[in-house]
Amino acid sequence: MSSLYPSLEDLKVDQAIQAQVRASPKMPALPVQATAISPPPVLYPNLAELENYMGLSLSSQEVQESLLQIPEGDSTAVSGPGPGQMVAPVTGYSLGVRRAEIKPGVREIHLCKDERGKTGLRLRKVDQGLFVQLVQANTPASLVGLRFGDQLLQIDGRDCAGWSSHKAHQVVKKASGDKIVVVVRDRPFQRTVTMHKDSMGHVGFVIKKGKIVSLVKGSSAARNGLLTNHYVCEVDGQNVIGLKDKKIMEILATAGNVVTLTIIPSVIYEHMVKKLPPVLLHHTMDHSIPDA
């Protein structure tokens, strides 16, 4: 099975590293001698030769810390990642990647109501499915980790397929305030794109009212398949829907060298937020940074 990578930069750097590993002459085994203890060797040799590869500064502390090391005294070969595991020599252990992850499969959550009898959730019907349109900040819906674009499959054991938004809200309204069992699929219309900032701190795209309108040729955004006519839903897992472009760019600027965007096709986004007052998106939507 082919290896998986969070970004094109990770794939290319790993290929270059593996080529160096294969080209390195194998040293013959030597008798064990009492020598001074040396620091554990890095698995990937000659990293300095890859400095500034694809516009990346590979000698940075972040990258050095993410590289796999051979345990001291271990003379056995180091095996590669297992099937389905990510290989990330550049991205490393990125919190943004983890926060933005769209998990496959379905999960069950237990929702409740606040002292006003509210869940903080607004739902919308799309293609016979029921989706999260709005999660209000500091509400039961935000506390259980529901996000914009999540699909609700069941509410208290009842299938939601074909329900109108009105029916769904009525079912939630009549449900118990202590426990509402909801089966959810993570954001099926959305996908994530992981990119790396260049020496100027840019990843290479332009937004207008939250929508990606152009890409910079040769940038990390272009290399990694970021698409125009898509809206930015999250930056490193933090919801940015409804925020001004200036605020979104500020969040991007303060992010690390690795940035993961969650995007959604404009036709789906515009249908989902239709008839939703912009003030709710800007001031009411949960824009907090989620737990990893």
Curated annotation (Swiss-Prot):
Entry GO MF terms: identical protein binding; phosphatidylinositol-4,5-bisphosphate binding; protein heterodimerization activity; protein homodimerization activity
SUPFAM superfamilies cross-referenced by the UniProt entry: PDZ domain-like
Compartments, record wording: Cytoplasm; Nucleus, Nucleolus; Nucleus, Nucleoplasm; Cell membrane
Domain of life: Eukaryota
GO biological process, one term: nervous system development
Comment field on protein domains: Binds phosphatidylinositol 4,5-bisphosphate (PIP2) via its two PDZ domains. These domains target SDCBP2 to the plasma membranes and nucleoli, two PIP2-rich regions.
Function text: Binds phosphatidylinositol 4,5-bisphosphate (PIP2). May play a role in the organization of nuclear PIP2, cell division and cell survival.
Name used for this protein in its record: Syntenin-2
Source organism of the structure: Homo sapiens (Human)
Gene for this chain: SDCBP2
